[in-house]
Amino acid sequence: MLEGRILAVSSQTKAVSGIPGAPKRVSFAKIREPLEVPGLLDVQTDSFEWLIGAQSWRERAAARGDSAISGGLEDILAELSPIEDFSGSMSLSFSDPRFDEVKASTDECKDKDMTYAAPLFVTAEFINNNTGEIKSQTVFMGDFPMMTDKGTFIINGTERVVVSQLVRSPGVYFDHSVDKGTEKDLHSVKVIPGRGAWLEFDVDKRDTVGVRIDRKRRQPVTVLLKALGWTTEQITERFGFSEILMATLEKDNTAGTDEALLDIYRKLRPGEPPTKESAQTLLENLFFKDKRYDLARVGRYKINKKLGLNLGQPIVASTLTEEDIVATIEYLVRLHAGDTEMTAPGGSAVPVEVDDIDHFGNRRLRTVGELIQNQIRVGLSRMERVVRERMTTQDVEAITPQTLINIRPVVAAIKEFFGTSQLSQFMDQNNPLSGLTHKRRLSALGPGGLSRERAGLEVRDVHPSHYGRMCPIETPEGPNIGLIGSLSVYARVNPFGFIETPYRKVENGQVTDQVDYLTADEEDRHVVAQANSALDANGHFTDDRILVRRKGGEVEFVSSAEIDYMDVSPRQMVSVATAMIPFLEHDDANRALMGANMQRQAVPLVRSEAPLVGTGMELRAAVDAGDVIVTEKTGVVEEVSADYVTVMADDGSRKTYRMRKFARSNQGTCANQRPIVDEGQRVEFGQVLADGPCTENGEMALGKNLLVAIMPWEGHNYEDAIILSQRLVEEDVLTSIHIEEHEIDARDTKLGAEEITRDIPNVSDEVLADLDERGIIRIGAEVRDGDVLVGKVTPKGETELTPEERLLRAIFGEKAREVRDTSLKVPHGETGKVIGIRVFSRDDDDDLPPGVNELVRVYVAQKRKIQDGDKLAGRHGNKGVIGKILPQEDMPFLPDGTPVDIILNTHGVPRRMNIGQILETHLGWIGKTGWNVQIAGDGSRPDWAEQLPEEMLSAPADSNIATPVFDGAKEDELTGLLGSTLPNRDGEVMVASDGKATLFDGRSGEPFPYPVSVGYMYIIKLHHLVDDKIHARSTGPYSMITQQPLGGKAQFGGQRFGEMECWAMQAYGAAYTLQELLTIKSDDVVGRVKVYEAIVKGENIPEPGIPESFKVLLKELQSLCLNVEVLSSDGAAIAMADGDDEDLERAAANLGINLSRNEAATVDDLAN
């Protein structure tokens, strides 16, 4: 029997994927997997360990047999060394990078806005070549950001992720096109280095072979060969077989090497006087010098592989060689001639074919380590320039490595990368799954990658070589579709940056447990069978003809003797988020894409609930995401409280695990951990001690299991609207906690220092009631918009004093300085409870930006119940907005009186073809009620239950079920189990074997005319909450030039009354309504103040004036030198001067309206 664990926990297996103490989940899986899911964060952590040359990485490399490889930092220092001065009399070299301890813990860094980093030291050796004197020193190279064990970086207190980049691998690429005019076949080849100049060869429609160096003008290829020192005889000897190359040679009239060199120089450097020496140096520098040209190990490997050059030897030369160029040309002419095979002198035979640049053999991954390494290379090369200059200016005797080195450019380069690079992103912390997916993301965008505009359809499309490497389903909708992907579950990245996926070896028709990781190139050479091919107990295929796939994704039936490999697992091709969709095989791909993406937008609820119907992936995903706490050593739980768990390990050591309590995530959701173990309980290594957000008993739990009826209801769930029961509001089933951070700082200004104080001018005592003596709000205070969180005053400019005031000052001394209120207030539309305050002050030696004396952060939490307008979704792309919340007594109910929780419309299913949601609903009901399969007297099972594992024949109520992707419950099994569900306590079975029940109308008590599908579906509350979107404004800020209200909630803007809305008003002839919309409600500056005055005084609304936008139009026409005048009805010119300013100022001052743009005048301010 083949060994290997079944996917999820069943009653016999103690654990799933090696995690002890896992909750029980009954699984439908029928295929055994010989391989555990690898660490889901390895793509990040392994790469960073390579960069810093960590011990664990060295051990892994040695186990793989890569003993010669050095770490990323060592590589780059070796590449830089030695730095020589211009005369070559002295040199500086670097070696042995090493790190000190990290300065502060991750929590401290987040709290104090610090970067989680360790000091980097290198050994620098200065050699004076004239005297032979060597000076060696340890040099500090700046603080180097370190990766946390969760694969993230903490930069200035915020958690960030560096996304892996998909780029075209260095190497040679052959291409084929057809000439539009002559319909001739044209072939071309590009030699793409890791860095340096491109070299391109092509055969044009006149059948001549040409070359372009560094994207300059085309020349005959024989010119380049002659420039490399080849004589006409040598060229004829090597390429005599090719007519087109011989024809090119005849047309080329350069005499010898010197003339060819000059010819190339003229094309590359037009306008400079060519000499033989400068031409020779130019060509050398372009392709044959380490400093200027680098193929990288991967480029050398690809070129050797493609052209069949010295394949056996280790990879050494990182520059081009003459043989590379000649072999490339030969390959090109053979490709044009239609040959199928080529053997380079001293090399091995390779097939001659064009390349597909979207193939994963030609696209590689730049992971974190390499991206940082490239950035450090930039910084070091800037530093190298400084070192050279200092070598020439400083006194040779006094020079030490320390005096030569300036680390600023290196530190700046690293800072720039983490702070501003497109690939260093603010981590998505909506829930554990979104964080995990973010770390496994593959992006084709970014520096050195594609841009959205230039990327065509081919790059974005699903390619056969993505299988098992990049998920074909999980990608964003919109402009980035296909450019951003997600790593498949079992994929890993090899040292060259190519993505590998595991396969089981098949020998003579027998499947072994030997697992080989193959790159896309290697996989093309083999015949691969699917994971669900039927096997017998010895691993032999049971069918005569087996469905396999060959190169290019073609499928066919072959005999078992021809098969080389077999898939490791049915979920090999999908990513983690996609692998968490049950019945994925019954969903249309477009909807599955939405389902995978929407799981990442799930908001952590107050109480998490694991899904009744899962896929067996929930536990591993939650544990690897790192938001749950796992035991580091086997032992016994000694003490448990809400804040920490202490474990006494078997070796006598104690470890205290601290919980994160109600912390704010990057997205403003609430990250809270709580223990799930008891005192005295024995815990194994790797067991879950505490749940985080969106987890239950260590399993990912993004939503809730709700009783759903799938039916239309009075048209209230038309167009994907959702009807909910009031119970979900009252019992806080879909309630989430959101935490906002508000920050204010007190700075030094030109007029004096700002001050955080309780003493605010012109403010009533009620407003200050919740502030403490410092002027900061107390913890636990309930606040709503406009309330003061932190009192602050700013000095105002001294005004001209009247003689009376001056006299009073002279008598009574210095009067209190004029200050204005610049307190931190709760933004418009937000409410909540203050749960935390952090005060940083210069006096306490806190690290603050220059000019800032004090910084206060206030955390306000709000509990958001579910309400109309919030967005809910299932896992199958079935999303909708809540249209109505019905009282519990009006909801349809089952025959035993149970009201349903949620009503979804039937019309959302057929056209979208996501039938998975219906199957999930049925299986959810089966799991909730429990089941018992009737076994005949002779022990035989019903036909549908033949395939079921033994422990699946019966289960109690509330059983969690796993139905793995592509290996889940079959339709006949569902029908059979629906007929075997356990009765309720009255002995009745509510739902028939077709999955439908007779529902009764809650309002009338009458049964609905048709049976309705009822069951349990996993429903997720998404981050699109109506509270964050709803917005209203009376008065507020105006745009500087047009004087119209700003737009958008963030700017506290108004609602736009656009062109089409105006047409609607015109159609109804609503002239006066339209006039006030376009003038006094918008940009008639004087009019709107007068209207406000009239409303306050209870007078009639005055006549509208001239809108500001009309004045702007006039000015724009005048700026085009057009003389535009405004005429009144009697033909007299009207002056459009801003003559009304005085009236405006007077009216505004009387009303206390602030007309400056910066501070929004709210109604509350005016009331004060």
Swiss-Prot record:
- The set of disulfide-linked cysteines is none
> Which superkingdom is the protein from?
Bacteria
Cited NCBIfam families: PRK00405.1 (NF001616), rpoB (TIGR02013)
PANTHER family, sorted: DNA-DIRECTED RNA POLYMERASE I SUBUNIT 2 (PTHR20856)
> Which family is this protein grouped under?
Belongs to the RNA polymerase beta chain family.
Cited function: DNA-dependent RNA polymerase catalyzes the transcription of DNA into RNA using the four ribonucleoside triphosphates as substrates.
Output the Gene Ontology terms for molecular function: DNA binding; DNA-directed RNA polymerase activity; ribonucleoside binding
Cellular component GO terms, alphabetical: DNA-directed RNA polymerase complex
**Gene name linked to the record:** rpoB
Q: Native species of this protein?
A: Rhodococcus jostii (strain RHA1)
Biological process per Gene Ontology, one example term: DNA-templated transcription
Keyword line: DNA-directed RNA polymerase, Nucleotidyltransferase, Transcription, Transferase
Which reaction(s) does its UniProt entry say it catalyses?
RNA(n) + a ribonucleoside 5'-triphosphate = RNA(n+1) + diphosphate
Name of the protein in question: DNA-directed RNA polymerase subunit beta
